[in-house]
Amino acid sequence: LSLNATVGASINDIQEDAMYLKGGLEQIPNFFHYGNINVNTSKRNESKWHDQVQSVFASAELGWNHQLYLTVTGRNDWASQLAFTSKGSYFYPSVGLSWLVSESVKLPKAISYLKVRGSWAEVASSPNRYLTQMQYTYNEQTNTYEYPASHYNTNLKPENTKSWELGVNAKFLGNRINLDMTFYRSNTFNQTFYVDASASSGYKNNICLLYTSPSPRD
């Protein structure tokens, strides 16, 4: 019997604080400096944002007699993109089981190696930033801040993909022929998309959730 386990935590922190200035050159050709930009054609834009995801995770693999292996993982994320919603954190697990048949059962000589496997997993991710609260946008044409085109949504949830997989790995004739066959299916939930808003709302579109989207099979 064997056991391997891992426990950890991480913080992914990304920030941007930038100002952009563009326009025609003033006097000196090919001298690209803000002091050489024509003030009559110059346009300024600013960008400032801060994303952070805090995570804890764990995994464990249990093996028996070098034949049967069980793998379990789990991860929980707290994402700043989900601020102002009721779903500030999200958990996604996985479990997998594999069996080395060639180590357990006497097979015909033509079969050098045989393993069967199965797994089920969830994968989650946050929506884009600033979709859950009012966020003014900068108009470089008028140098003013304006209402956003999209109406924010405080009911957003993390995008979630659930999938399961069955597979076979086999080798034949002294490893001269290899076979790797997989059958899987996955469904994606809570995808973010935009729909046209009523003109009287003052917005161009609304931010909504698509509940599920089945994927093709292999």
What are these regions (language model features)?
Residues 1-213, 217:
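Extracellular/periplasmic, surface-exposed regions of secreted and cell-surface proteins
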